[in-house]
């Protein structure tokens, strides 16, 4: 039996450990935030040579190299999320699956460095007209969720609110309404001065008006970071089969408020396999 009860306990019990390094005297600390659609694995041979079992060690290598402080994944089946959890012992984890609120379907799990953050609360809601129950929203093809956590940063003493999502790939109305709902919830939940990160696969390119309700309240890392990729490395790589023009498939985003974006990068390096997913991870480095 998987660790549903343990996951629930992690949402209410503080995680131990004190970060003793990572911040130079006189400097505010950086925080690295990553969004990564890991590509679902409903069965072992799914995607053939690109199946999860052929990619999973490379995924861990990428994460060990990048060292994100906060990580939000999309499309994670429980076997994938459990594997990441087992191989990333320095991280805490929360995430339930969208089809039953437990272990059926995909999860937008979030991970945080236990030496950096202490969990205060976490939960999940559905992108629908009835967000607090398992439900399908508007014209969406699939149930879609937002997984969120309120974390206390041990270095700064500040609260950090982290929201992670995956918008529908079919329903235009579902994508439009999803952004409005998320912003309404953020306004309802988060005190004015607290730091917010919103990551995910939005199934909408960076310049799509569907993202306007989010842009009205939160900045977008790719557009505002001091060091960035404005040429538009595509975050959706389609296993190398699509060859879209630069900037045509930038659909994974990091939105934020309350910090300064220093760097945005698409992690499309060599991790020992041709592709670690059909999406590249994106990571933002921020300064308080």
Protein language model regions, located:
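Bacterial Sec-dependent N-terminal signal peptides
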Residues: 1-29
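N-terminal, active-site-proximal structural segment of metallo-dependent hydrolase catalytic domains
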Residues: 19-87, 100-105, 180, 288
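Short, Asp-centered acidic motifs that coordinate Mg2+ and/or phosphate
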Residues: 31, 69-70, 160, 195-197, ...
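Acidic/histidine-rich helix-loop elements
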Residues: 35-57, 127-141, 168-171, 239, ...
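Active-site metal-binding loops of divalent metal-dependent hydrolases
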Residues: 36-38, 165-167, 201-202, 280
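Structured beta-strand-rich core segments of catalytic domains in phosphoester-bond hydrolases
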Residues: 70, 74-159, 163, 266-267
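Metal-dependent phosphoester-hydrolase catalytic domains
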Residues: 173, 177, 184-196, 203-288
């Amino acid at each position: 039996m998987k660790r549903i009860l343990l996951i629930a306990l992690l949402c209410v019990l503080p995680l131990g450990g004190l970060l003793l390094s990572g911040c130079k005297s006189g400097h505010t600390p950086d925080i690295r935030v990553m969004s990564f659609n890991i590509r679902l694995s409903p069965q072992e041979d799914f995607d053939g040579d690109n199946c999860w079992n052929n990619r999973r060690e490379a995924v861990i290598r990428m994460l060990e190299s990048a060292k994100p402080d906060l990580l939000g994944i999309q499309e994670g089946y429980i076997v994938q999320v459990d594997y990441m959890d087992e191989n990333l012992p320095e991280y805490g984890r929360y995430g339930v699956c969208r089809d039953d609120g437990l272990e059926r379907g995909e999860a937008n799990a979030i991970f945080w460095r236990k030496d950096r953050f202490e969990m205060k609360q976490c939960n999940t809601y559905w992108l629908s007209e009835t967000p607090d129950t398992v439900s399908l929203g508007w014209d969406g093809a699939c149930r879609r969720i937002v997984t969120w956590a309120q974390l206390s940063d041990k270095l700064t003493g500040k609260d950090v609110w982290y929201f992670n999502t995956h918008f529908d790939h079919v329903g235009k109305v579902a994508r439009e309404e999803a952004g409005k709902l998320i912003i309404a919830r953020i306004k309802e939940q988060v005190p004015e001065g607290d730091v917010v990160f919103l990551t995910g696969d939005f199934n909408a390119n960076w310049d799509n008006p569907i993202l306007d309700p989010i842009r009205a309240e939160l900045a977008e890392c790719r557009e505002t970071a001091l060091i960035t990729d404005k040429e538009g490395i595509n975050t959706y790589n389609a296993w190398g089969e699509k060859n879209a023009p630069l900037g045509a498939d930038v659909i994974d985003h990091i939105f934020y408020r309350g910090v300064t974006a220093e760097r945005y990068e698409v992690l499309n390096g060599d991790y020992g396999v041709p592709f670690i997913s059909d999406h590249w991870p994106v990571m933002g480095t921020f300064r308080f």
